[in-house]
Amino acid sequence: MRPEKSFQGLILTLQRYWADYGCIILQPYDMEVGAGTFHPATTLRALGPKRWNAAYVQPSRRPKDGRYGENPNRLQHYYQFQVILKPSPEDIQDLYLKSLAAIGVDAALHDIRFVEDDWESPTLGAWGLGWECWCDGMEVSQFTYFQQVAGVECAPVAGELTYGLERLAMYVQGVDNVYDLNFNGRDGAEKVTYGDVFLQAEQEYSRHNFEHADTAMLFEQFKMAEGACKKYLDAGWASDKKDKHLMALPAYDQCIKASHVFNLLDARGVISVTERQSYILRVRELAKACGEAWIHTEAGGVRG
């Protein structure tokens, strides 16, 4: 299945490429997240001393970006391909360029540029030195050297690659409208487009996100997720010495829920500018507490 002929072929090619490199190929996290970085395979596994190489597709939701299916390249639900390499290899840029070649983008034939763009996620309490990757004037990927995640310094530094799958697919297929992407690589009556799969969902979720999401319920859900996260964090310490944590992952799930609910409230326009900063801070405090708990788990590097 040729990557330049189908959306799913592009995904399969990236999975094979990074599997051959030595990454474990994970599945998407089964929660509503705003970006692939929120997957615990990146946010939490970037912390601690243990080696970690993983790649996965992650459906991502940004409610405010919906356009009722009327914009050719703006979506409230889209896909990222995420690669996390810890410690970051010295040849990460070369590895990335070879991955582009694997999906049909030859650096010798195209203008590939790396534009400095340091990355920050306020809600995750994370930042890193980064570059946008431009191909013939269009941003197609981002790579970042994580310096801090969840308020915890990254040692060793992890390298993260994020591919915008729809944008890359539009580029290699040569289409101007995301809904025209060939999804399955077939022609004629057997051809399935991106629009066949997702256009109705974009229309319906735009109505939901902007017009009908129950704001009273969402405010309550935020408080419940915030409270549950704090409860699990408190309950997870194995002893009063707080030297080992036993429930970092369930707590982090609640942090993810709080973040998505905040994004829905933001899309509904019921949060003021001042309140918005307060909500971001509240989610960040949860994320930082989860990161602190994680580095006291076995996978986070604690002994015993």
Curated annotation (Swiss-Prot):
Query: What GO cellular component is one of the record's annotations?
Result: cytosol
State whether keyword Glycoprotein applies.
Answer: no
Q: Which Gene3D superfamilies does the annotation name?
A: Bira Bifunctional Protein, Domain 2, Class II aaRS and biotin synthetases, domain 2
**Which coarse location class describes where this protein primarily resides?**
cytoplasm
Q: Which CDD domains does the annotation name?
A: GlyRS_alpha_core (cd00733)
A molecular-function term among this protein's GO annotations: glycine-tRNA ligase activity
Alphabetically list the UniProt keywords.
Aminoacyl-tRNA synthetase, ATP-binding, Cytoplasm, Ligase, Nucleotide-binding, Protein biosynthesis
Q: Where in the cell is it found?
A: Cytoplasm
Please list the GO biological process terms of this entry: glycyl-tRNA aminoacylation
Q: Which PROSITE patterns match?
A: AA_TRNA_LIGASE_II_GLYAB (PS50861)
- Could you say which EC number(s) this protein's record lists? 6.1.1.14
Q: Decide whether keyword Ribonucleoprotein is in the record.
A: no
Please name the top-level EC class of this enzyme: ligase
Q: Could you tell me what reaction this enzyme catalyses?
A: tRNA(Gly) + glycine + ATP = glycyl-tRNA(Gly) + AMP + diphosphate
Q: What family does this chain come from, according to its entry?
A: Belongs to the class-II aminoacyl-tRNA synthetase family.
Quaternary structure and partners:
Tetramer of two alpha and two beta subunits.
What PANTHER family has UniProt attached to this entry?
A: GLYCINE--TRNA LIGASE, CHLOROPLASTIC_MITOCHONDRIAL 2, GLYCYL-TRNA SYNTHETASE
Q: What is this protein called?
A: Glycine--tRNA ligase alpha subunit
Q: Which gene encodes it?
A: glyQ
